């Protein structure tokens, strides 16, 4: 709900907006990257096929809850261990939130352990590929901030 949201983004015609209302100053960076990711997501989805078959990166028996209040307890094992699939419960609500939480963590320091998981690494790879394709960055040799934890080759 808007009462508990720390940020939101939307597009009005050719204008893009991000509104931030973090509860703590420390969460400002995370909230900014998260909402920025949603804007990026829209472009990747309209300009590329990078997110086609996104659900194939998840276990076969998993389905996004599509509900912010859903009980995700049955999937708790997907949040830990070497084959971790999701950053947190919120990432299990919608594919866009999964990608936003991954992008947010990929852009902030201290998250190496999250991306040691082959599944999260594959998701990050897909996100990075999508961004490069959508913004015509495929031939740019530099690594971008969100690629700092990428271990797979481009």
Sequence positions of predicted segments:
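Active-site-flanking segments in enzyme catalytic domains
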Residues: 2-154
């Amino acid at each position: 709900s808007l009462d508990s949201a720390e940020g939101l983004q939307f597009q009005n015609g050719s204008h893009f907006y991000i509104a931030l209302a973090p509860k703590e100053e420390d969460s400002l960076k995370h909230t900014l990257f998260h909402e920025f990711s949603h804007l990026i997501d829209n472009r990747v989805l309209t300009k590329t096929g990078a997110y086609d078959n996104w659900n194939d990166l998840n276990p076969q028996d998993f389905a996004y809850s599509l509900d912010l209040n859903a009980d995700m307890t049955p999937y708790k094992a997907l949040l830990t261990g070497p084959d971790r699939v999701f950053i947190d419960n919120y990432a299990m609500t919608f594919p866009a939130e999964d990608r936003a939480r991954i992008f947010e963590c990929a852009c902030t320091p201290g998250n190496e352990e999250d991306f040691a998981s082959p599944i999260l690494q594959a998701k990050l790879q897909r996100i990075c590929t999508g961004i490069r394709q959508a913004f015509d960055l495929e031939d740019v040799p530099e690594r971008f901030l969100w690629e700092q934890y990428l271990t797979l080759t481009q």
